[in-house]
Regions:
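Polybasic/polar functional segments that serve as interface/processing modules
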Residues: 1-133
């Protein structure tokens, strides 16, 4: 699932702690499992570039990953929730858009790897065992 969020609260888009919390809590809320703690970086503005800074973060999941890129000066955020497991994309969209105060959201949900998922049940059990669950 990809989300492009417009008209977001600019302070929230630059809030390292809030975005860490989003990446830390969302996986459990949508039935996924973190493989590692989230990593979140404040990105400073770059001279001679359209990039006026923001925050980039991601969390690696047993099921894949979630990433976020924010552009506070523009009130814009781009988020990917990539998973080899189905999840409630409507819930994820509403949770994220409310948290960031988005006025408009473009959502794309694409089913990928339909042949690969035949191997998934064994893989998730193995990954859970490795992660100590």
């Amino acid at each position: 699932m990809t989300l492009d969020l417009y008209g977001c609260d600019k302070k929230k888009l630059n809030d390292h702690e809030l975005l860490f919390k989003l990446l830390d809590e969302l996986p459990e809320k949508i039935g996924m499992h973190k493989f590692s703690e989230p990593i979140v970086h404040l990105i400073p503005p770059r001279e001679n570039s359209f990039d006026r800074g923001g925050v980039t973060g991601f969390v690696i999941l047993v099921e894949s990953h979630i990433s976020i890129h924010t552009f506070p000066a523009d009130g814009f955020a781009s988020i990917d929730v990539f998973s080899c497991k189905s999840f409630d994309s409507k819930f994820a969209e509403q949770y994220i858009s409310r948290l960031l105060g988005a006025e408009k959201v473009e959502t794309n949900v694409k089913r990928r790897g339909r042949e690969f998922v035949k191997h998934y049940p064994k893989s998730i059990e193995k990954a859970d065992a490795i992660a100590g669950r």
